């Protein structure tokens, strides 16, 4: 796919976006100061709710926060009424290039320019739902097309969250998410980049770095299966191979995230020192201990499991998926008790973009307090994305990424599913 094709796709999309939804237009931050006022403001670091709350914004940054702030001459005052202001939300596990439906068919039937348009619309939907920063965990066959989407957002040409991108995930031949079951004589586009050895891993990582990847995503385990009446998951890369990947990523100034469930794959990932283990269930006590010791983030992704359970093809499959969800919930409580660091990621894409705030509700349902979930999302999420001290808190010097919800999310976390105001970088996208 050429750069020219991607640019044509993005320009065409930008026209559609601006006509269809003027509130979603990308724009530069205004030159005049803005004062945001609301009944409540959440200090995520302390858990304290400031009543009332005000934020002074100049350009794309926060200047002052408190019960009252300066109102410089020429300021625009936005009164958000009986709402709570908090930092823009973070989703640490998304797929902009996916939509509901069979993933293999999307790769086979949809061109990369078409999927890039889909991704840009998804980015807008996520932003309008209050997600001002996200980590895209693989284009699933669209290569480095996410680079163009990220750059267009950064340049203010299209609306969307701040993005950390990975390009395609890295996979072994015949591994998880590979296009299996097709005529072997028919060329089918792979959903990931293949690497079967440590040397091949390093070569693929260098190519992805060249193409603009912010981090590396590796499939460390395959699909769950039942063996001897128990859930089991095969690993794909050895500890030595993952260590080589983590070492090379560090040399490139990047970090490694792994898709991993079960043993020994999750243990290999923890021993290698990856940045996050996504999905993160069926963990041994040793893996849990290492994750706490090395501060490796667990990203549970409950919402995708719930979605698959609720939309299973047969009642039997639905029952199995719901059983797996309960297993995940038990594992989650064990990880919370062990103080494993958590981040919030939904795996949105296979279910509709803009609906992923359901993840907050499920994490509370399965054992965390609303404040703990918000701290995991905003403080840990900012750290995982490499933007700590830039996003994730409402403090002077941070980017002016602010959302507002009705009521108090510490009392009713489901209010995060009803974001009514969105500012990113000093630009109001929704009010």
Locations of regions flagged by a protein language model:
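Bacterial N-terminal signal peptides
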Residues: 6-21
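Histidine-rich, glycine-flanked metal-binding segment
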Residues: 30-32, 41, 46-86
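Histidine/acidic-residue-rich catalytic or RNA/ligand-binding cores of hydrolases
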Residues: 101-103, 146, 175, 226-229, ...
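His/Asp/Glu-enriched, well-ordered alpha-helical/loop segment
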Residues: 251, 255, 324-409
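Divalent metal-dependent hydrolysis catalytic cores, especially in the metallo-beta-lactamase
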Residues: 119-145, 159-169, 213-224, 255, ...
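Histidine/acidic residue-rich metal-binding segments in metalloenzymes
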Residues: 148, 198-298, 322-341, 389
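Metal-associated gating/positioning segment near the N- to mid-region
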Residues: 80-157, 173, 240, 272
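Active-site mouth loops of central-metabolism enzymes
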Residues: 105-117, 185-202
């Amino acid at each position: 796919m050429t750069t020219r094709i991607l640019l044509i796709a993005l320009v065409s999309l930008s026209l559609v976006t601006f006509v269809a939804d003027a509130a979603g237009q990308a724009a530069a931050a205004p030159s005049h100061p803005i004062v945001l006022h609301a009944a409540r403001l959440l200090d995520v670091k302390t858990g304290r709710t400031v009543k009332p709350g005000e934020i002074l914004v100049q350009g794309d940054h926060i200047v002052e926060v408190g019960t009252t702030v300066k109102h410089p001459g020429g300021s625009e005052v936005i009164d958000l009424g009986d709402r709570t202001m908090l930092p823009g939300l973070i989703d640490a596990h998304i797929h902009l290039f996916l939509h509901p439906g069979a993933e293999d068919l999307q790769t086979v039937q949809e061109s990369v320019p078409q999927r890039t348009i889909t991704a840009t619309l998804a980015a807008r939907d996520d932003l309008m739902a209050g997600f001002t920063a996200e980590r895209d965990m693989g284009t699933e066959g669209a290569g480095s097309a996410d680079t163009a989407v990220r750059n267009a957002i950064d340049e203010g040409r299209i609306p969307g969250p701040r993005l950390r991108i990975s390009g395609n995930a890295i996979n072994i031949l015949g591994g998880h998410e590979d296009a299996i079951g097709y005529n072997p004589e028919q060329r089918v586009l792979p959903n990931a980049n293949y690497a079967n050895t440590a040397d091949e891993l390093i070569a693929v990582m260098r190519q992805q770095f060249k193409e603009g990847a912010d981090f590396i995503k590796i499939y460390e385990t395959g699909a769950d299966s039942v063996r001897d009446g128990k859930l089991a998951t095969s690993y794909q890369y050895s500890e030595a191979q993952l260590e080589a990947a983590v070492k090379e990523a560090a040399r490139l100034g990047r970090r490694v995230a792994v898709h991993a469930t079960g043993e020994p794959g999750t243990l290999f990932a923890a021993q290698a020192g990856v940045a996050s283990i996504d999905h993160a269930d069926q963990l041994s006590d040793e893996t849990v201990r290492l994750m706490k010791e090395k501060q490796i983030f667990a990203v549970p992704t409950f919402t995708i499991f719930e979605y698959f359970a609720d939309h299973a093809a047969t009642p039997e499959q639905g029952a199995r998926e719901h059983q797996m969800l309960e297993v995940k919930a038990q594992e989650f409580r064990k990880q919370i008790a062990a103080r494993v660091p958590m981040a919030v990621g939904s795996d949105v894409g296979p279910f509709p973009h803009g609906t992923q705030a359901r993840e907050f509700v499920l994490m509370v349902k399965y054992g965390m307090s609303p404040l703990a979930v918000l701290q995991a999302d905003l403080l840990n999420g900012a750290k995982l994305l490499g933007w700590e001290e830039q996003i994730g808190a409402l403090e002077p010097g941070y980017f002016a990424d602010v959302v507002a919800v009705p009521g108090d999310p510490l009392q009713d976390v489901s209010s995060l599913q009803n974001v009514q105001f969105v500012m990113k970088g000093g630009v109001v996208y929704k009010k």
